[in-house]
């Protein structure tokens, strides 16, 4: 399956208060910076506590994910299928098609987990979970439900559009670089100083490194 959108999740930033937008904006800038050397055209934007990367035309999937995994502040990178809201019956067909293409081996367990950010949607999260799960079971009787430890956790986020994903690639975590103070790092020649630099950069500190040649 070819993905043209990534949904990016952040962690600690979500705990911020009225200044959360500053951290989100910094993270968007870092994502754009990380993708500037990747072949392809990317539109990075934020909406409703999520950051999205829309990939226009051809791009290198593996290279894109590799660069995103290095961005401090991201805890999850989700390749998503973005769907227009054409009604629930169409959504069920799209979900069945997604499961069929993503998981040719149907000897799996699954769970549907939905998030209804669009409160005007006619079904609540529990109804979405049950009805989509029923559609999958009707289409593939060999698939089983496991709500505790499923092989596949199928996420459905209902917003202005509908986002479907079942992969969450781990991110670097931490805070975006530039959201804390600056610091100087003395590179002594051992392994401890670059490790310390990595750990403090992960807290959002912008580092300038110094090395004395003797």
Predicted features by range, described:
Residues 1-184, 194-214:
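RNA-binding accessory domains that recognize and position tRNA/RNA substrates
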Residues 190:
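Conserved G/P- and acidic residue-centered "switch" motifs that form tight phosphate/ATP-binding loops
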């Amino acid at each position: 399956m070819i993905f043209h959108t990534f949904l990016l999740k952040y962690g600690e930033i979500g705990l911020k208060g009225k200044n959360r937008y500053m951290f989100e904006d910094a993270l968007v800038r870092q994502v754009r910076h990380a993708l500037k050397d990747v072949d392809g055209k990317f539109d990075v934007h934020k909406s409703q506590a999520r950051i999205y990367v829309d990939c226009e035309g051809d791009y290198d999937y593996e290279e894109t994910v590799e660069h995103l995994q290095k961005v401090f502040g991201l805890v999850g990178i989700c390749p998503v299928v973005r769907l227009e809201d054409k009604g629930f019956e169409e959504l069920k067909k799209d979900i069945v098609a997604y499961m069929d293409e993503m998981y040719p081996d149907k000897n799996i367990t699954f769970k549907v987990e939905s998030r209804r950010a669009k409160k005007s949607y006619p079904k609540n999260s529990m109804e979405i979970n049950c009805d989509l799960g029923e559609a999958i079971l009707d289409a593939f009787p060999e698939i089983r439900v496991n709500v505790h430890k499923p092989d596949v956790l199928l996420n459905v986020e209902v917003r202005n559009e509908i986002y479907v994903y079942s992969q969450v690639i781990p991110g670097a975590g931490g805070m975006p670089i530039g959201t804390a103070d600056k610091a100087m790092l003395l590179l002594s020649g051992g392994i401890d100083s670059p490790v310390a630099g990595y750990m403090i950069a992960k807290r959002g500190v912008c580092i300038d490194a110094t090395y004395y040649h003797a």
